Amino acid sequence: MRHSNSGKKLGRTPSHRKALFRNLAKALLTHGKIRTTEIKAKELRRVVEPLITLALRNDLHARRQAYSVLGSHQLVKRLFDEIGPAFVGVPGGYTRVVKLGQPRRGDCAPLAIIEFTRTVAASEAAAAPAEAE
């Protein structure tokens, strides 16, 4: 029985779930908005919102905790230098999940967009590949 066990299993092993949400969190922090299934978007909030709360603390221990989740120094720098300052004074609710009307072709899965509630300053790292194309 799964009494009081929060979170969805998504038909994956714990290590697969951890890798999935780590990759989705990296994509959201990099692009600011991603399209995924509705359930994954709702579960991703449980990973990303504490990361932004860590960015608001902005101390060495918070950076190390964020690195343990993200595994990328560039993303930790972007999180603490660009994304965190955009949410100063906001008590929570850093992301929004917008349901899309059309389901995914093939398996009819309900889709959603997860994005930040505030606009985040564009980084030079994210802008450089766009200018090169």
Swiss-Prot record:
InterPro entries tied to this protein: Ribosomal_bL17, Ribosomal_bL17_sf
Entry keyword set: Ribonucleoprotein, Ribosomal protein
Gene3D superfamilies linked to this entry: Ribosomal protein L17 (3.90.1030.10)
Keyword Ubl conjugation on entry: no
Coiled-coil spans in chain: none
Cellular component, GO annotation: cytosolic large ribosomal subunit
GO biological process, one term: translation
Entry GO MF terms: structural constituent of ribosome
Transmembrane intervals: none
Pfam families: Ribosomal_L17
NCBIfam families on file: L17 (TIGR00059)
Quaternary assembly: Part of the 50S ribosomal subunit. Contacts protein L32.
PANTHER family: LARGE RIBOSOMAL SUBUNIT PROTEIN BL17M (PTHR14413:SF16), RIBOSOMAL PROTEIN L17 (PTHR14413)
Family (UniProt): Belongs to the bacterial ribosomal protein bL17 family.
Protein name per Swiss-Prot or TrEMBL: Large ribosomal subunit protein bL17
Species the sequence originates in: Nitratidesulfovibrio vulgaris (strain ATCC 29579 / DSM 644 / CCUG 34227 / NCIMB 8303 / VKM B-1760 / Hildenborough)
